[in-house]
């Protein structure tokens, strides 16, 4: 992701979002509960396996220790040398099977009821002297064979059946306890999921309420955790949506109000023309007819300008603009050509530095044209308008459009960028009251700033200087200041 953002322009919006994957059909509550159950099941299984393994190993080690201890006792007591038959018979009382083998002479054996001490090849090897010791499990018995220093062999075995029963009972207990643990985990997971996701449920209900009823009331914020911040973010979205709808309603209302005046005047003039064309109606003098035609054309142009401005505003609001690298100097040149055709009596003093901005070329062109049109409109006949573009730091350049008109009072400077605002002195001038609103909207969307100052502070008249700061970079064509 860092590599994707490294080459991004100042103010450039992020690229298209990554493709999303189909959402799971399992609800978030079930996923949380299943996750908790899975963790508990894994923990219970690991614990049960560990307990069973440790217990099993301990029980088998205990049997081995019993066999070794019994053999050691028989050897150290020398009872096998004194009376081997009695010693082997006594071993049977300790739940063990025993055999004492004296090569070439005799074999003493004592077994538990229903059991036989198994003698296999390992035990035979000990009896033959090939091995000194053998310890193994065979026929559900643990068998120990030891070669004594006298050449005799002692064999002991103990049944594993009691140990198997203990381990079986232990497995049953672990299974029951584990099952209860999973059940408790499922119940606890469901309760935790219900309690933890209750704010998400409120958000879902609020979103459904907005979609169903257009009710944009904020949701109460409880706590200060992540879900509370999510609720605050959702409330911010609701406020932004409410403000957007309010702006749309205000735009429609203001547009209807602004269109009413030229439409009424146009309708009156058209009706007057139609009445004059009826048979027997008095003819309008040619001078008045020419004035009437001029008024109709002016009213149509006024409505066309207003509709065009409204289209520009709604286009920017919709966010459908195509962003690309824009040469601001070229935008200024094209705008100057259009303004000069309308006001060829105005002298434009241009000094610009090559500068590029990543953004909407059409929107930037409209903003620059509106600034130049506004300056030309308020300039006296034969006046001069200054147009300057200078780099103020590595990432920003400032466009200044100044005139020598009457200026804007300080108390109105914050209002001139509002839609349809027209000061008392401006109401007698042509215009829709949307030009500077478009400028503000375009500049802010490109991450810029704007302010109003006097061209000649304290002068009579003071004039107006519009300062627009735009992020971007120097044009590769060069950074020397160009004079036009």
Curated annotation (Swiss-Prot):
Any one GO CC term of the record: plasma membrane
A molecular-function term among this protein's GO annotations: phosphoprotein phosphatase activity
Record CDD domains: HAMP (cd06225), HATPase (cd00075), HisKA (cd00082)
Transmembrane segments: 32-52, 173-193
Compositional bias segments (type: Low complexity): 1-10
Catalytic activities: ATP + protein L-histidine = ADP + protein N-phospho-L-histidine
Keywords (A to Z) from UniProt: ATP-binding, Cell membrane, Hydrolase, Kinase, Magnesium, Manganese, Membrane, Nucleotide-binding, Phosphoprotein, Protein phosphatase, Stress response, Transferase, Transmembrane, Transmembrane helix, Two-component regulatory system, Virulence
Ranges where the HAMP domain occurs: 194-246
Region described as Disordered: spans on this chain: 1-23
Gene3D superfamilies the record matches: 1.10.287.130, 6.10.340.10, Histidine kinase-like ATPase, C-terminal domain (3.30.565.10)
Membrane topology label: Multi-pass membrane protein
Phosphohistidine found at: 257
Residue spans of biased composition, Pro residues class: 11-20
Protein name: Signal transduction histidine-protein kinase/phosphatase MprB
């Amino acid at each position: 992701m860092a590599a994707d953002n490294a080459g991004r322009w100042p103010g450039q919006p992020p690229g298209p979002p990554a493709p999303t994957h189909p959402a799971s059909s399992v609800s978030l509550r079930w996923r949380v509960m299943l996750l908790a159950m899975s963790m508990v099941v894994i923990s219970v299984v690991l614990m049960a396996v560990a307990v069973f393994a440790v217990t099993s190993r301990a029980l088998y080690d205990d049997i081995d220790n019993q066999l070794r201890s019994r053999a050691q006792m028989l050897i150290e007591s020398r009872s096998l040398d004194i009376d081997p038959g009695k010693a082997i018979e006594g071993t049977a009382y300790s739940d063990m099977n025993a055999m004492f083998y004296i090569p070439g002479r005799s074999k003493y054996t004592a077994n538990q009821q229903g059991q036989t001490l198994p003698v296999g090849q390992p035990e035979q090897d000990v009896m033959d002297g090939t091995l000194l010791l053998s310890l193994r499990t065979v026929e559900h018995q643990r068998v120990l064979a030891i070669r004594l220093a006298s050449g005799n062999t002692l064999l002991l075995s103990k049944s594993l059946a009691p140990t198997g029963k203990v381990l079986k009972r232990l497995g049953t207990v672990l299974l029951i306890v584990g099952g209860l643990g999973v059940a408790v985990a499922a119940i606890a997971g469901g309760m935790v999921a219900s309690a933890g996701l209750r704010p998400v449920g409120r958000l879902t209900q609020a979103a459904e309420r907005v979609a169903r009823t257009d009710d944009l009331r904020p949701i109460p914020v409880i706590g200060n955790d992540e879900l509370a911040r999510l609720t605050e973010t959702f409330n911010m979205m609701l406020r932004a949506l409410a403000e957007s709808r309010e702006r749309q309603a205000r735009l429609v209302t203001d547009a209807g109000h602004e269109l009413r005046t030229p439409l009424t005047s146009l309708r009156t003039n058209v009706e007057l023309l139609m009445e004059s064309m009826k048979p027997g109606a008095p003819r309008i003098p040619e001078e008045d007819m020419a004035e009437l035609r001029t008024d109709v054309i002016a009213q149509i142009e006024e409505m066309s300008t207003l509709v065009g401005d409204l289209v520009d505003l709604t286009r920017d609001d919709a966010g459908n603009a195509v962003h690309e690298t824009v040469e601001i100097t070229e935008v200024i040149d094209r705008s100057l050509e259009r303004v000069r055709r309308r006001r060829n009596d105005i002298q434009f003093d241009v000094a610009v530095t090559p500068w590029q901005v990543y953004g909407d070329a059409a929107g930037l062109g409209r903003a620059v044209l509106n600034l130049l049109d506004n300056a030309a409109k308020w300039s006296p006949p034969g006046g001069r308008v200054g147009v300057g573009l200078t780099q103020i730091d590595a990432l920003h350049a400032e466009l200044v459009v100044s005139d020598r008109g009457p200026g804007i009072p300080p108390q109105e400077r914050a209002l001139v960028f509002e839609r349809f605002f027209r000061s008392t002195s401006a109401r007698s001038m042509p215009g829709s009251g949307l030009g500077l609103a478009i400028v503000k909207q375009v500049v802010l969307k490109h991450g810029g700033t704007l302010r109003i100052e006097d061209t000649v502070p304290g002068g009579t008249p003071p004039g107006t200087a519009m300062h627009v700061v735009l992020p971007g970079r120097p044009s590769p064509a060069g950074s020397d200041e160009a004079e036009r």
